[in-house]
Amino acid sequence: MSAAQILCLGEPLVEFNQTPEGQFAMGFGGDVSNVAISASRHGANAGLITRVGTDPFGAALCGLWTDEGVSTAHVTEAQGEETGVYFVTHDTDGHHFTYRRTGSAASRLAPDDLPLDALQSCPMFYASGISLAVSDSMRAAVVAAAEATRTAGGVFAFDPNLRVALWPLEVAREVTHSVMAACDIALPGLDDARQLTGLQPPEEIVRFYHDLGPRIVALTLGADGVLISVDGDMRTLPGHRVDAKDATGAGDCFNGAFLASLLDTQDPFAAAEHANMAAAISTTGYGAVAPIPTLSHTRSALNAAWQS
């Protein structure tokens, strides 16, 4: 496999989703894993930096990444440790998540685990707010990896991806703003950004993030599309009309498709157009991974949209 163009650091998870019959179907989760898979399906050489346990769940994740063309060269199989899992149950009040991730193999990732040579030769490094919230050691690893990539001339892309169940909002604000100040590409979602910044209008949020440091800000707006800005040149790309069933992982799909397209075209606006369509398509199926479209699927849908 060719050297990775995008290295993604975070915690992968195995999902057990309750079926209508009361059984649990196994699937895969973890935002950074989803981004790597989306980037790979959209033509980039993507790789993961993480740790999994020497258990059937870690083996299943490694098998998934191999099947998806995502490099596992920097995935450590930690002897005697466990892979994080979560359960999704359903009732009249909606979906409920139960996590079993405390002390997981991934949560023990630390700066000493980083493949510095690979990071220094990689054009792009990606992490999320969840990567920062999982543990203090993973947070330190994200900061060190971003510094290694940027010092060598690469770029750092970051999605603040807020999970208040993982850490208090005030702590999340302080840490994510600090990391955002050291990134080149900001990929926030509107709901998360409103909580983190205290601002409401999308344009004000974009200006806030530009002022922190990122040159490129792609603020995803859910079904309303994306507000993409390069050095303050803002353009809103409306959402695409689709038969949406499940928006799980749509933001991750956007991020992977955007970064892959940006590496290919070097045009943030074209990349946002491409990723906007990919994310829309991903909502037409169920789950985070299965509905992520391929490069050819996304291009065909874009061509059809332009011709209509």
Mark where each language-model region is:
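Conserved phosphate-binding/catalytic region of the ribokinase-like
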Residues: 1-5, 147-148, 198-308
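Conserved N-terminal subdomain of the carbohydrate kinase-like
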Residues: 45-129, 154, 299-308
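Structural motif
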Residues: 5-7, 123-124, 185, 216
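Glycine-rich phosphate/adenosyl-contacting loop at the front of the ribokinase-like
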Residues: 1-71, 243-245, 308
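Structural alpha-helical scaffold elements that stabilize or flank donor/cofactor-binding regions
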Residues: 117-118, 178-179, 210
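Conserved beta-alpha-beta core of the PfkB/ribokinase-like small-molecule kinase fold
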Residues: 124, 130-207, 224-226
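Active-site flanking residues adjacent to catalytic metal/cofactor-binding acidic residues
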Residues: 10, 158-160, 188, 219, ...
